[in-house]
Amino acid sequence: MSTPFVTTLSPSLHGLLKDRLEEKGFILTQPQYTIFQARSPSVTCVLYSSGKLVVQGKGSKEFIKFFLEPEILLTFTHNRVEEDLRPRLGVDESGKGDFFGPLCIAGVYAKDEETLKNLYKTKIQDSKLLNDAQILSLAKTIRASCSCDVMILYPEKYNELYGKFHNLNILLAWAHATIIDQLAPRPSGEVFAISDQFASSESVLLNALRKKNTDISVIQKVRAEQDIVVAAASILAREAFITAMTKLEQRFSLKLPKGASAQVKSVGKSILNSRGKEVLSLICKTHFKTFNEICDSASA
C-alpha cells in the first residue's frame, strides 16, 4: 500500500477543491470530523475540519501530479516572477474532463519582445482562475497582439477521432501537434513551444510532432499554464469551449452542465429518456464511463 499524501489546505481553497472534484465525477460525503470526503475508483481524498488534506489510492500519484498540484495547491502561487521575453509558442486545451461538449485546443505565438511585454501588461493567467466574462474579454486582447489558432472538436468529430486513436493522450498529442505545426515559423530558429505534460511520457507528443512538417523544439512540463503564453492559449481554448457549449445548447434546446458530476449524469439520463441515445451521442464524449452508466441505467 502506498503512503498517503498529507498536506494542509488553506481555507480559501476548500471550496475550489470541492467544486473541481465534483466536476471530475468524485462522489462526495461528509463523515464526522471532515469538511468532505471525495472518492473515485482509484483515489480517496479527505479534507478534515482542521484543514488537513489526505490523498491515497492507486491513482493518487497521477491525481497529485496532474491535478492537485497544478490546479489547487499552486493556485495561490501564480504571481508572475521574472518576465521571459523569448519568442515562443504556447498550447493548451479545454473540455478534456467535461462529459458534455467539445474538446478545444488553442495555440498562441508571441513572436517578439514587444508582443510579450504587451501580454505581461494584461491580467492574463491560467484560465481556471478566471470567470467566463474575464475569459471572453482577455481573448480579444490576445487575438489583437498574437498569432493564434484554435481547434474545436465537437462531440461527433471527437468521438470519431477517439474511435481512431483509442487513447485520449494520443488524441491530445495529435491535436497539440497540429496546432503547433500551424503556428510554428519556418525555419523555427530560436522559437520554441511549451505544452502541458498531459501524458506520463513526453514521447507521446514528440511522436505526433515527428509526423508534422516542423523542426520546432518543445518543452513539456506540469503546470505549463504558469507561462504567460500557455496561459494565453488556455484562455483561447476556454473561450472556444464556452462558445461551443452555447451553440450546442441552442442547437438542441438543452442546458448542459460542465464537468462530470452527479448532476451531469442526471441530465444525461433525462436527455437519453426524452431524446434518445443518438442525440446524447451528439453532445457528449461517449468513451466516458458516464455514458455507459447512463445507458445501462436506462436498460436496467
Swiss-Prot record:
Alphabetized InterPro entries for the sequence: RNase_HII/HIII (IPR001352), RNase_HII/HIII_dom (IPR024567), RNase_HIII (IPR004641), RNase_HIII_N (IPR024568), RNaseH-like_sf (IPR012337), RNaseH_sf (IPR036397), TBP_dom_sf (IPR012295)
Binding site for a divalent metal cation: D92, E93, D196
Major localisation: cytoplasm
GO cellular component: a single term: cytoplasm
Family: Belongs to the RNase HII family. RnhC subfamily.
PANTHER family per record: RIBONUCLEASE, RIBONUCLEASE H2 SUBUNIT A
HAMAP family xrefs: RNase_HIII (MF_00053)
Stated name of the protein: Ribonuclease HIII
Organism: Chlamydia caviae (strain ATCC VR-813 / DSM 19441 / 03DC25 / GPIC) (Chlamydophila caviae)
Lineage: Bacteria, Pseudomonadati, Chlamydiota, Chlamydiia, Chlamydiales
